């Protein structure tokens, strides 16, 4: 365990742990991966006792990615929702997936794809859907949000702690919110 970020890799049959800042505490707990996880959880991240709302377990969850992939847009989302209802499926939670926003770290609708987001959400609610939006902890590096987050110290830093780390994930290069920051 470490309270600071660390890097883990497997090389030549060995597990390599690199903690640029802080220390790593090695503890043996249990004889299975489950037992080790339960011990680590109890010591470092105990369950809060809260669970998602009952709705997440009692109604279908639909996701627009299956229909639209990166082409999330108001017209096709409404067509998808109407087709669910028109084909006799129950409404439930409708998650609008990646690419509804202008860019990562910005939570405004793309106006070229969503001319009336409030109207769309109102229509989805009228059909009986609860609406969720896909978000991720990434921020486009060349953005106003990135600069503000960097100034506040709200981003994961690189190995030497001198600047925000820019990560290569499946959707390009992004900085990442530091979710360990108590602010």
Describe the role of every protein-language-model region:
Residues 53, 114-115, 137:
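Proline-rich low-complexity regions
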Residues 78, 108-113, 147-152:
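Short secondary-structure boundary/capping segments
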Residues 54-59, 94-98, 164-169:
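Short amphipathic alpha-helical segments, especially helix-boundary/capping motifs
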Residues 136-183:
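Active-site-adjacent "subsite" loops/lids of carbohydrate-active enzymes
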């Amino acid at each position: 365990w470490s309270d600071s970020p660390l890097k883990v890799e497997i090389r030549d049959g060995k597990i390599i742990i690199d903690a640029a800042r802080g220390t790593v505490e090695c503890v043996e707990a249990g004889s299975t991966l489950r037992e080790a996880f339960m011990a680590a959880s109890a010591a470092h991240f105990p369950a809060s006792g809260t669970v998602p709302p009952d709705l997440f377990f009692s109604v279908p969850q639909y996701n627009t990615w299956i229909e639209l992939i990166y082409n999330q847009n108001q017209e096709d989302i409404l067509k998808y929702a109407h087709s669910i209802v028109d084909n006799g499926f129950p409404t439930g939670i409708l998650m609008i997936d990646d690419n509804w926003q202008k860019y990562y770290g910005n939570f405004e609708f793309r106006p070229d794809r969503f001319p009336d987001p409030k109207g769309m959400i109102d229509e989805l609610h009228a059909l009986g859907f609860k609406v969720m939006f896909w978000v991720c902890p990434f921020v486009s590096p060349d953005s106003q949000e990135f600069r503000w987050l960097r100034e506040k110290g709200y981003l994961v830093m690189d190995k030497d702690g001198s600047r925000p780390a820019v990560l290569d994930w499946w959707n390009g290069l992004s900085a990442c919110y530091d979710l360990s920051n108590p602010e």
